[in-house]
Amino acid sequence: GTWYAHASVGCLHVRPVLDMKLGADVEKMRAIAEEAFALVRQYGGSHSGEHGDGIARSEFNEVMFGPKMAKLFRRVKNLFDPHGLFNPGKIIDAPNMDARELFRFAPGYSVDEFPTQLDWSVWPGAAGGLQGAVEMCNNNGACRKLDGGVMCPSFRVTGDEKDSTRGRANTLRLALSGQLGPEAMASDDMADTMKLCVSCKGCKRECPTGVDMARMK
């Protein structure tokens, strides 16, 4: 794995290399998180840094902030959202951060073989490696940026998730794994998802993981 930081504010990012398809690596992720959060509390830091708590960290809020503050969080949330309609599961009543039903790769996830015209063999997985290439999208959302760079021109025009590199990659992943039905790869919906990709290769250059949607299309 790797560590990097915003040195000026003392914010560390922990990036272990783990395969979230494997139960053993999911257990490692939780162990790493618990140990890291214990260190954060020991040194009086914040487990979210400049980020929100979200699904990944809300589970630990009561331990981090104490029961009194956790009760105040609940009071505020209940005052503004008594029916739990707005972004539920954040800050209070959070699921476990390692709940497998929240993962992109749920238990039993698999991809069948699929004939391809291009060589994807530098990536692992089924469909000659296309699976691995598609799964390089880790949902970081850089393709949704609106300032600077090129990626992703179609999303910048429509503002629709399906017209972003991430939206297209997730559609391909769901189709390859059979979650959109047996004919999804050749469906009208797939064609509609891909039609506004202008093959600019901005994603290959600017995506942090180098997702090449023009080639996949």
Predicted feature locations:
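Ferredoxin-type iron-sulfur electron-transfer modules in oxidoreductases and energy-metabolism complexes
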Residues: 103-217
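Conserved glycine-rich FAD pyrophosphate-binding loop
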Residues: 1-139, 159-161, 167, 196
